Design a protein with these regions (language model features):
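Active-site-proximal or metal-binding-adjacent scaffold patches in catalytic folds
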Residues: 1-50, 59-93
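Walker B catalytic acidic pair
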Residues: 55
Length: 93
Protein backbone atom coordinates (compact mmCIF):
# COMPACT_ATOMS: atom_id res chain seq x y z
CA UNK A 1 0.00 0.00 0.00
CA UNK A 2 2.83 2.40 0.85
CA UNK A 3 4.50 1.87 -2.51
CA UNK A 4 1.19 2.36 -4.31
CA UNK A 5 0.58 5.68 -2.54
CA UNK A 6 4.18 6.74 -3.15
CA UNK A 7 3.88 6.02 -6.85
CA UNK A 8 0.48 7.69 -7.15
CA UNK A 9 1.69 10.91 -5.51
CA UNK A 10 5.28 11.01 -6.79
CA UNK A 11 7.13 10.16 -3.56
CA UNK A 12 10.15 7.91 -3.12
CA UNK A 13 11.31 6.10 -0.01
CA UNK A 14 14.46 4.04 0.38
CA UNK A 15 13.30 1.44 2.89
CA UNK A 16 10.28 0.38 4.93
CA UNK A 17 10.46 -1.27 8.34
CA UNK A 18 7.73 -2.51 10.64
CA UNK A 19 8.20 -2.18 14.39
CA UNK A 20 6.14 -2.89 17.49
CA UNK A 21 6.17 0.78 18.43
CA UNK A 22 3.92 1.93 21.25
CA UNK A 23 4.66 5.63 20.81
CA UNK A 24 4.53 6.42 17.06
CA UNK A 25 2.26 5.36 14.23
CA UNK A 26 5.19 5.96 11.92
CA UNK A 27 8.36 7.93 11.34
CA UNK A 28 10.65 8.92 8.50
CA UNK A 29 14.43 9.20 8.68
CA UNK A 30 16.53 11.81 6.85
CA UNK A 31 17.56 9.00 4.48
CA UNK A 32 13.88 8.59 3.47
CA UNK A 33 13.46 5.29 5.30
CA UNK A 34 9.95 4.87 6.68
CA UNK A 35 9.25 3.05 9.94
CA UNK A 36 5.71 1.90 10.67
CA UNK A 37 4.04 0.54 13.80
CA UNK A 38 2.29 -2.81 13.83
CA UNK A 39 -0.56 -0.98 15.58
CA UNK A 40 -1.52 0.56 12.23
CA UNK A 41 -3.35 -2.70 11.54
CA UNK A 42 -5.96 -1.65 14.10
CA UNK A 43 -6.91 1.54 12.25
CA UNK A 44 -9.54 1.98 9.54
CA UNK A 45 -8.07 1.97 6.02
CA UNK A 46 -8.48 5.71 5.46
CA UNK A 47 -6.43 6.46 8.60
CA UNK A 48 -3.75 3.96 7.61
CA UNK A 49 -3.51 5.85 4.33
CA UNK A 50 -3.30 9.12 6.25
CA UNK A 51 -0.34 7.86 8.31
CA UNK A 52 1.39 6.47 5.21
CA UNK A 53 0.90 9.75 3.36
CA UNK A 54 2.10 11.68 6.42
CA UNK A 55 5.37 9.75 6.44
CA UNK A 56 5.72 10.00 2.66
CA UNK A 57 5.35 13.79 2.93
CA UNK A 58 8.26 13.72 5.39
CA UNK A 59 10.45 12.39 2.57
CA UNK A 60 10.13 15.91 1.13
CA UNK A 61 9.51 18.07 4.23
CA UNK A 62 11.25 16.69 7.34
CA UNK A 63 9.21 18.89 9.69
CA UNK A 64 5.67 20.02 10.37
CA UNK A 65 6.00 23.42 8.69
CA UNK A 66 3.29 25.17 6.70
CA UNK A 67 4.84 23.66 3.56
CA UNK A 68 4.48 20.17 5.06
CA UNK A 69 0.79 20.72 5.86
CA UNK A 70 0.17 22.23 2.41
CA UNK A 71 1.64 19.06 0.90
CA UNK A 72 -0.51 16.92 3.22
CA UNK A 73 -3.59 18.86 2.15
CA UNK A 74 -2.68 18.27 -1.48
CA UNK A 75 -2.37 14.49 -1.09
CA UNK A 76 -5.43 14.15 1.19
CA UNK A 77 -7.68 16.36 -0.95
CA UNK A 78 -7.83 19.07 1.72
CA UNK A 79 -8.65 16.70 4.59
CA UNK A 80 -5.31 16.63 6.44
CA UNK A 81 -6.46 18.37 9.62
CA UNK A 82 -9.77 16.49 9.70
CA UNK A 83 -7.94 13.15 9.40
CA UNK A 84 -5.36 14.22 11.98
CA UNK A 85 -8.15 14.95 14.48
CA UNK A 86 -9.79 11.61 13.75
CA UNK A 87 -6.50 9.73 14.24
CA UNK A 88 -6.06 11.30 17.69
CA UNK A 89 -9.17 9.40 18.83
CA UNK A 90 -7.26 6.12 18.48
CA UNK A 91 -4.72 4.81 20.96
CA UNK A 92 -1.87 2.42 20.35
CA UNK A 93 -1.83 -0.93 22.11
Amino acid sequence: RLLDLASRHGFTCTDVKIFNSKSHWGSCTPRRSINLSLSLMLLPWHLIDYVLLHELCHTIEMNHSDRFWALMDKVTEGKALELRKELKKYHML
